[in-house]
Amino acid sequence: EARNLAPLPGDVDFTVGASVAMPGLTAWQGLVEHGRLQAGQSLLVHGAAGAVGSMVTQLAREFGAYVIGTGRAADRQKALDFGAQQFVDLDNEVLEDVGGVDLVFDVIGGDIGKRSAGLIRAGGTLVSIVGPPEARPADGLAVDFVVESDRAQLSEIVQRVRDGRLRTNIGNVATLDDAVTALNPTERRSGKTIIRVRP
């Protein structure tokens, strides 16, 4: 429906535009609506080098939060480049060494999601986009959500991309002929995969 759309400025590339909506809205709604992130708070974002995690990181920094990203060793530099101030290699470092945080943004779930609940400070929030959290913070909230279309929020996000305050994270651009291979869920990738359709 038209009410769910926002215009793409003429000076924003279509490929960039295609990579903005879902990661941007997911990050915005998770941080602002569900996580109620405030300046000066600390945030732990799982998958910080991914399409959603990199948006979460950048927006959280803009909002004045201290951001700790997680991922694999190969993701460290990318997560730091997107603005994470600290990084935890989930394969080789101890997640619990992070200490307490005000907000966890979980894009992974499973064991990592469960362990993250124990990192939430009193009054903090665990936000999950992978389903209801399996563990809840002892003295905080656990929230899961499904992103919703929102024209005003999308316009805010697109304007930030246009102004250079927010960068998209495109991992791969493929043709429609290569879509099955490009979107193979068994392949590990970092960033958004864009399928280019030509008439």
Task: Label each PLM-derived region with a short phrase.
Residues 1-199:
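Terminal helix/beta-alpha structural elements that buttress the NAD(P)+-binding lobe
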